[in-house]
Amino acid sequence: MLTSLRKLKFGTKMNLIVAIVVLVCIGIMALVIFSQSRSTLDKEAKTMLYNVAQRHANKIAPIFDESFALLENTQGVINNFLKAGITLDNKTIDESVSSLLDTSNWAKYAYVFLFEPYAHNGLQKDFVSKNGKSGYLMIYRDDDPTRIGGVHRVNAESKVLDFSAVQNAIQEKRSIFGVPVEITLEGESFHAVNAVVPLFSGNQLIGVLGMSINLDTIIQQIVLNKENSVYENDFISILSTGGVYAASDDISLFGKKIAEVNTHPSLQQITDAQAAHTSGVYEYINRHGKEAIGGVSTFEVWRNTGSFWSVLVSAPQTSVYAPLRKITITMLVSVLASFASIVFIISLFVRLALVKRLSSISNALFEFFKYLNHQRKDAPNPLKIIAQDELGQ
């Protein structure tokens, strides 16, 4: 190889060396810029996904908290009635629960179940007996939760006593936030989560009061709302305790555990984060089998319910790093154009300013030596000084 280089002309050697040096320098500069761009883009993307997850969590948590606040307020009103000796007749219950449901913007149904000994003047049509519990069940529906009015009482359906939140509230005698469930009442099905509080007369449990929060509304306004999209093909999922889908872009996932839908080991860090009641950003393989980045925000529903939900905002890395591909192409074109321009200009300079002048000097010297050796009769013409540099002096 060295032999081949020695055979090259001076200008070619110089051009080759300059080209290699320029290419290496530009390449290093491009790699540094690429690395810094990716690092910055990665940091900003993770920050954005985390902030978006936090923003949605800050929208959803108040919905649930509002429901519990209304329930506990009504719970307090009923307790005060009992302390004052006011009978819990149909009118009192109707007014209390109707006001509760009408105030809520997210609940579709509210219900109160009073054990048989504590329901005064209960209507026979409201009497239910199920799961070893007997009493009077009153169910109320709000036809339009976003507006005042529209609340009315509907027929009692004993399936309400099958709600896990109702059963747990009776057994544990505390406020319970249930699991995502598909509810069918009055022949209409919808996705919901139940919030239930116990009712006491002194220290004696006399029944429960609950609401069915309409998750379909949350899905439409938050999960499926395209205005909430930050990257192409991203999606929002709301996970209840245990990583169960409460809302997602695919309604068929409702009620399923995320770990059952996506069995890739990388998902473990997300399920662990929810189990530890923490938030963060994680790189993982999403349920579509693509590399993704997910922002997770975990929050507790109300106070001391022990129910922790999470919002997962996931975006494929191909979408997150899409700007980087544009930067890379632009950089590559710029590097090649710069390299070609620099090499062309330097080659032109070497050929005109160095090689041509060196050739003239070399020819003049050879002719001068011929004159000294009497190989020619007349002296060669002297060189013209065209530059005040090493070759021109």
Predicted segments with their positions:
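Extracellular/periplasmic ligand-binding regions of membrane signal-transduction receptors
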Residues: 50, 54, 61-95, 103, ...
